[in-house]
Amino acid sequence: MNKEIMIGNHKISEDSPTFVIAEMSANHLMDFDRAVAIMQAAKDAGADAIKIQTYTPDTITLDCDDPCFQITQGTIWDGTTLHKLYETAYTPWEWQPKLKKIAEEMGLVFFSSPFDLTSIDFLEEMEVPVYKVASFEINDIPFIRKIARTGKPIIMSTGIAYLADIELALRTCKEEGNENVILLKCTSAYPAPVSYTHLR
């Protein structure tokens, strides 16, 4: 894998300044102006990039009341379904090209975590400069392969992965001629107990 990767006009390497990514996620609360304000706050705080997530409720889960699709882990969303949660959490696709333009005018790199093959196609039309692979997608090899084929840098989280999963994902990228991969150490618990982080 390459030791030096360009994301926009930012060089990512061991001796480069830290590349700071602000995650918007669902914090816009389905309000476009709030999304823009979040990007401005990120820029004002010194972020280099803003990251969103690209999915719809129907591309990420099933509209189903089955117990497997109910939220019951003692959160503020208990009693709702995943589909209903994602209806209030996703970033509308019609916003995304507009948000990208505004972010770039602010001097931010704008990119996303796709969650299915159609969202990769959509982000390619938007010409995002880099992709973020969420921990829960690292073992979806057709998905990894499609992202790798774009030739763009890939930031890949490893939260639920075994070493074999990480090796397979990296090998898949390499097979597609893409060695611009950055691995992130991730603890897939929200919030993560400090004892799970293994940080010294």
Where are these regions (language model features)?
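Hydrophobic faces of well-ordered beta-strands that scaffold small-molecule active sites
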Residues: V20-A22, I50-I52, F110-S112, Y131-V133, ...
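Active-site mouth loops of central-metabolism enzymes
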Residues: I21-R34, Y86-T88, V109-F111
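Catalytic domains of carbohydrate-active enzymes, especially glycoside hydrolases
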Residues: A37-Q53
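Glycine-rich, proline-tolerant flexible connector loops at the mouths of alpha/beta enzymes
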Residues: A49-T88
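Active-site beta->alpha loop and helix N-cap motifs at the rims of alpha/beta catalytic domains
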Residues: I76-S135
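Conserved anion-binding
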Residues: P142-V194
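Conserved small/polar residues in nucleotide/adenosyl-binding loops
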Residues: T197-R200
